């Protein structure tokens, strides 16, 4: 069982062995996404940082930056093939980073003008709160949900 919390500690509980491993990352943790291999964890933090962590020894394998996340919980994910880290941010953008190099591959911002909330309050910032990679490897898609109530489906 893995947990991340506002104290900035990634905790791994081994229920069978009765053990707890803790890795201190210093900034509040907002999202955890386990790798398919079971030995890595994508950790998102309020310091506008995503970290790919090695669960065996607690080392950081890669760091992803260039987005804004300082106040809200923005869920991040990895694509099905684990080639990209994807996440929204507090400016309403969707970002993707290469998981091996850590380089930003792209960022995009959808048109929120169709949202009822945006029409009522066009100057209120929109945060992309949830990002999820689609399960179909043949047609990779990403679904995002924003604070204005919109859901967008993105294709590569």
Q: Over which residues does each language-model region extend?
A:
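Active-site lining segments that contact anionic ligands and/or coordinate catalytic metals
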Residues: 38, 47, 71-73, 82, ...
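Blade-level signature of beta-propeller repeat domains, shared across WD40, Kelch, NHL, RCC1
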Residues: 127-156
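Conserved strand-to-loop turn within each blade of WD40 beta-propeller repeats
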Residues: 4-7, 44-47, 87-91, 145-148
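Loop/turn segments within WD40 beta-propeller blades
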Residues: 33-39, 44, 77-83, 88, ...
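C-terminal transmembrane module of eukaryotic multi-pass membrane proteins
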Residues: 85-94, 99
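Per-blade loop-tip surfaces of WD-repeat and WD-like beta-propellers in eukaryotic adaptors/scaffolds
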Residues: 7-29, 52-62, 68, 96-114, ...
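A surface-exposed beta-alpha-beta supersecondary segment
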Residues: 62-85
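Canonical WD40 repeat/beta-propeller blade segments in eukaryotic WD-repeat proteins
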Residues: 27-34, 70-77, 123-133
């Amino acid at each position: 069982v893995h947990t991340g919390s506002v104290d900035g500690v990634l905790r791994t509980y081994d229920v069978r062995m009765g053990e707890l491993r803790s890795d201190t990352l210093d900034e509040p943790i907002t999202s955890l996404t386990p790798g398919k291999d079971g030995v890595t964890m994508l950790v998102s933090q309020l310091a506008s940082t995503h970290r790919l962590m090695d669960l065996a020894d607690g080392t950081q394998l890669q760091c992803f930056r260039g987005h804004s996340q300082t106040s809200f919980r923005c869920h991040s994910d990895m694509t099905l093939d684990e080639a990209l880290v994807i996440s929204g941010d507090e400016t309403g953008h969707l970002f993707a980073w290469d998981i091996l190099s850590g380089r930003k591959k792209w960022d995009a911002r959808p048109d929120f003008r169709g949202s009822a909330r945006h029409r009522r309050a066009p100057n209120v910032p929109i945060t992309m709160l949830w990002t999820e990679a689609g399960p179909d490897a043949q047609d990779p898609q990403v679904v995002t949900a924003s604070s204005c109530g919109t859901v967008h489906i993105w294709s590569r």
